[in-house]
């Protein structure tokens, strides 16, 4: 009876993976008493095939879930319509509640029938036995056998806790349950006294900004968190996850962040290979509709690196909602997991981000300054110009206020706090992070990210002459035109390197540098072009084109 109840309440099972020889326990090691032997039959190496009763019951419950999601998103319009028609009176609501209660009872009955179907299936009974054993005792053998199954991630046991590192338990400098530290925007009116009257005047605007951010704004910014989109992408995500596990020996793990969100991760270990880059770990930060199952992790994987992918809060197996604070909390536990559980030193970690993932990447670079390098592909400096691009001009004040208070993705500000090597990849046909049209390459916000970084690190070089010549170089629409501008100013790379190395030897590596202070205008132009070319590479493609492995290069450093 207990097993039947477990089948009724158990998670949905999607796939049973092939048994990987590299993960099997050595023959000399006896199994623990709590371990449950997983099946090795090749007939199970496929998507889980439910019996007819479970299959039909699952279809009914999935359809009900979709209808509930549609009802949730359309509820404001539905309530408005019902109110206008006078259907929200007590005499109309009571019968409706009876219908809703009856429907819930019917769905509960369908769930019980699904449980009976699972109970009659030996594959599911074997799976639920392993899952229960793992929850009782998270031994390495139980977790190894559980990894052979792909199921609803909500039932996956937590593998790593944000407080697990001993250094955080002993010190008070780590994150609290309220979250990690973020850079906050400065008040718009610093000289205005924050009186009670001013607070009351601001209250309607603050309420409006909050509602916009938590309804339309968040879903526009992170469409991957919308349930209906995830439901449509589920087959693709399952296929991508199977590829990572079966072909790349990926290991899935659930991390618990300081805000209580559970973060879905996938780790591919290449340290045992002959390739030297396998000793380096690339932490991948996906875009606003990207998932590690089908996202940018493929680029460093093809290049031979060890890779750690993770999903934003609210994406696929990760819980929560993707607001900046939750995003930073998630990134923090991912980096901690890489250091304290996977055993990588910060000097062996590379942060790689695509598009909106630049926010968490730059936050990690700012918060963990010892990481080896940062690579930002198709990213931007600040969210406000991009948000204003897609909203009406009459909403400018509301959009700016909402972004600054609730969705402040200040990539450039965070990146300037990092002292290590940085590489920016600009898509020359990018249609997403341009503020006008894709053909107008100067409206690409990656340009502004580069300029802000160089102006912070080399303020004397990026004075009038240097800034002007870098802008000309950024306007180049082809490699030929770019090379023409570079050669027009006769940039001597050996001279530029000697100047920078001499300054570093005398003054140390910490930015900002005052190099170029006593330099001629021609020298500043040469140095500015040299630095711009080292920090930004062009890739002739649109925003969503996968980055080829040969374009995944380590940033330049002295």
UniProtKB/Swiss-Prot annotation:
GO molecular function, one term: phospholipase activity
Top enzyme category: hydrolase
Sorted UniProt keywords: Hydrolase, Lipid metabolism, Membrane, Transmembrane, Transmembrane helix
Catalytic activity, as annotated: 1-heptadecanoyl-2-(5Z,8Z,11Z,14Z-eicosatetraenoyl)-sn-glycero-3-phosphoserine + H2O = 1-heptadecanoyl-sn-glycero-3-phosphoserine + (5Z,8Z,11Z,14Z)-eicosatetraenoate + H(+); 1-hexadecanoyl-2-(9Z-octadecenoyl)-sn-glycero-3-phospho-L-serine + H2O = 1-hexadecanoyl-sn-glycero-3-phospho-L-serine + (9Z)-octadecenoate + H(+); 1-octadecanoyl-2-(9Z,12Z-octadecadienoyl)-sn-glycero-3-phosphoserine + H2O = 1-octadecanoyl-sn-glycero-3-phosphoserine + (9Z,12Z)-octadecadienoate + H(+); 1-heptadecanoyl-2-(5Z,8Z,11Z,14Z-eicosatetraenoyl)-sn-glycero-3-phosphocholine + H2O = 1-heptadecanoyl-sn-glycero-3-phosphocholine + (5Z,8Z,11Z,14Z)-eicosatetraenoate + H(+)
Residues annotated as transmembrane: 60-80, 93-113
Biological process terms in GO annotation: monoacylglycerol catabolic process; phosphatidylserine catabolic process
GO cellular component assignments: endomembrane system; membrane
E.C. number: 3.1.-.-, 3.1.1.23
All ranges on the Cytoplasmic side of the membrane: 114-558
Pfam hit, one: Abhydrolase_1
Domain of life, source organism: Eukaryota
Subcellular location: Membrane
InterPro entries for the chain: AB_hydrolase_1 (IPR000073), AB_hydrolase_fold (IPR029058), ABHD16_N (IPR054518)
Topology relative to the membrane: Multi-pass membrane protein
Family from the record: Belongs to the AB hydrolase superfamily. ABHD16 family.
Annotated protein name in UniProt: Phosphatidylserine lipase ABHD16A
Organism, as annotated: Pongo abelii (Sumatran orangutan)
Gene assigned in the entry: ABHD16A
